[in-house]
Amino acid sequence: MPVPLLPMVLRSLLSRLLLPVARLARQHLLPLLRRLARRLSSQDMREALLSCLLFVLSQQQPPDSGEASRVDHSQRKERLGPQK
């Protein structure tokens, strides 16, 4: 019977670990976000910041697997050196 218990144990461990992290983030991030909102009172400034943020987030996409495998293969060849 240990197999059905494993997901439940993992879930409870994760919730116990993540809850304090979420509280800590909320305590520190909310005042910063409120201060930022006060500074960004103009609509143009908010839109400019949002567009920059969306651009940065769109650039952090993981490479597709085909591209990564080609890079791994070439790096492996460089590490191994010339074949005899």
UniProtKB/Swiss-Prot annotation:
Region (Disordered): 60-84
GO cellular component, one term: endoplasmic reticulum membrane
Induction remarks: Up-regulated during differentiation of myoblasts. During muscle regeneration.
Expression across tissues: Specifically expressed in developing skeletal muscles throughout the limbs and body wall.
InterPro entries: Myomixer
Chief place where the protein resides: membrane
Compositional bias annotation for Basic and acidic residues: 67-84
Phenotype upon loss of function: Perinatal death due to a reduction in fused muscle fibers. Embryos are motionless and lack skeletal muscle: they are nearly transparent so that internal organs and bones are apparent. Myocytes differentiate and harbor organized sarcomeres but are fusion-incompetent. Myoblast fusion is impaired downstream of membrane lipid mixing step mediated by Mymk and defects caused by the absence of Mymx are due to impaired fusion pore formation.
Subcellular location: Cell membrane
Variant or mutagenesis effect after changing residue 52 to A: Abolishes the ability to mediate myoblast fusion; does not affect interaction with MYMK; does not affect localization to the cell membrane
Residues in the Extracellular compartment per record: 26-84
Cytoplasmic side: 1-4
Keywords: Cell membrane, Membrane, Myogenesis, Transmembrane, Transmembrane helix
Quaternary context: Interacts with MYMK.
Family of this protein: Belongs to the MYMX family.
Record note on domains: The AxLyCxL motif is required for myoblast fusion.
Name of the protein in question: Protein myomixer
Naturally occurring in which organism (per UniProt): Mus musculus (Mouse)
Source organism phylogeny: Eukaryota, Metazoa, Chordata, Craniata, Vertebrata
This protein's encoding gene: Mymx
